[in-house]
Amino acid sequence: MAITQFRLFKVCTCLATVFSFLKRLICRSGRGRKLSGDQITLPTTVDYSSVPKQTDVEEWTSWDEDAPTSVKIEGGNGNVATQQNALEQLEPDYFKDMTPTIRKTQKIIIKKREPLNFGIPDGSTGFSSRLAATQDMPFIHQSPELGDLDTWQENTNAWEEEEDAAWQAEEVLRQQKIADREKRAAEQQRKRMEKEAQRLMRKEQNKIGVKLS
C-alpha cells in the first residue's frame, strides 16, 4: 500500500513539473508577441517649412531716417521770452527763510526817583542815600545770542599768569621727584653699606674662631 502511494506521488510531481514548464513557455511566447507589437518607429526627418521665418535685420544707421530733422517754433522770440519770465516767477524762492532779520536793541531808561523821607525833616537820619538813584542810567537789554560787546574787557595778563602758575607747578613736581629719587638712592646705599659691614664682621668672627680652635 505504501509503495503504491509513493508511486502515485512521484507521478503527480512529474506531471506538475511538466505542466509548469509548458506554462512558462506559453507565457514567454505571449510576452514576446506583445513587445514586438508595441514597438513604434519615430520619424527622423525634420520639416523646415513649419519653422517661422526671421525678419530681416535692419542696420542701426537707418533707424533715424524717418525722424524729423528740424523743429520750427511758431510765435516769434517775444512769446518765448514771456514764457521764460512766467516760469521764473513761478519758481519758489528757496533762500527766503535764510534771510537774517536785524532787530534793534531795546533800551530801558530808569528815571530818577525822589528819596522817601516818611515825614522825617531834611538833615535828620533817614534812609541811606545809596538807595536813591542820583542820575538817569541807560539800561541796555542784552540779546541772548551775542550779548553786549561793549562791556567786554580783555585781560591780556591772564594768559601769562596761567602759564607762570603751570610752569611753577611743573617745577615743584620736578624738584619733588628729584628729591625722592635722591632719597631712595641714599637709602639703598645705606643698606648696601650695612650689609657689607655685617659680612666683614662675620668674616672676622670666623677668623677668630679658627685661631682659637
Swiss-Prot record:
<feature type="topological domain" description="Cytoplasmic">
    <location>
        <begin position="28"/>
        <end position="213"/>
    </location>
</feature>
<feature type="coiled-coil region">
    <location>
        <begin position="163"/>
        <end position="211"/>
    </location>
</feature>
<dbReference type="GO" id="GO:0006915">
    <property type="term" value="P:apoptotic process"/>
</dbReference>
<comment type="function">
    <text>May participate in suppression of cell proliferation and induces apoptotic cell death through activation of interleukin-1-beta converting enzyme (ICE)-like proteases.</text>
</comment>
<protein>
    <recommendedName>
        <fullName>Receptor-binding cancer antigen expressed on SiSo cells</fullName>
    </recommendedName>
</protein>
<feature type="modified residue" description="Phosphothreonine">
    <location>
        <position position="41"/>
    </location>
</feature>
<keyword id="KW-0735">Signal-anchor</keyword>
<comment type="subunit">
    <text>Homodimer.</text>
</comment>
<dbReference type="InterPro" id="IPR017025">
    <property type="entry name" value="Cancer-assoc_antigen_RCAS1"/>
</dbReference>
<feature type="region of interest" description="Disordered">
    <location>
        <begin position="179"/>
        <end position="213"/>
    </location>
</feature>
<feature type="modified residue" description="Phosphotyrosine">
    <location>
        <position position="94"/>
    </location>
</feature>
<feature type="topological domain" description="Extracellular">
    <location>
        <begin position="1"/>
        <end position="6"/>
    </location>
</feature>
<feature type="modified residue" description="Phosphoserine">
    <location>
        <position position="36"/>
    </location>
</feature>
<feature type="transmembrane region" description="Helical; Signal-anchor for type III membrane protein">
    <location>
        <begin position="7"/>
        <end position="27"/>
    </location>
</feature>
<keyword id="KW-0812">Transmembrane</keyword>
<feature type="compositionally biased region" description="Basic and acidic residues">
    <location>
        <begin position="179"/>
        <end position="206"/>
    </location>
</feature>
<keyword id="KW-0472">Membrane</keyword>
<keyword id="KW-0597">Phosphoprotein</keyword>
<keyword id="KW-0053">Apoptosis</keyword>
<dbReference type="GO" id="GO:0030141">
    <property type="term" value="C:secretory granule"/>
</dbReference>
<keyword id="KW-0175">Coiled coil</keyword>
<keyword id="KW-0333">Golgi apparatus</keyword>
<keyword id="KW-1133">Transmembrane helix</keyword>
<dbReference type="GO" id="GO:0000139">
    <property type="term" value="C:Golgi membrane"/>
</dbReference>
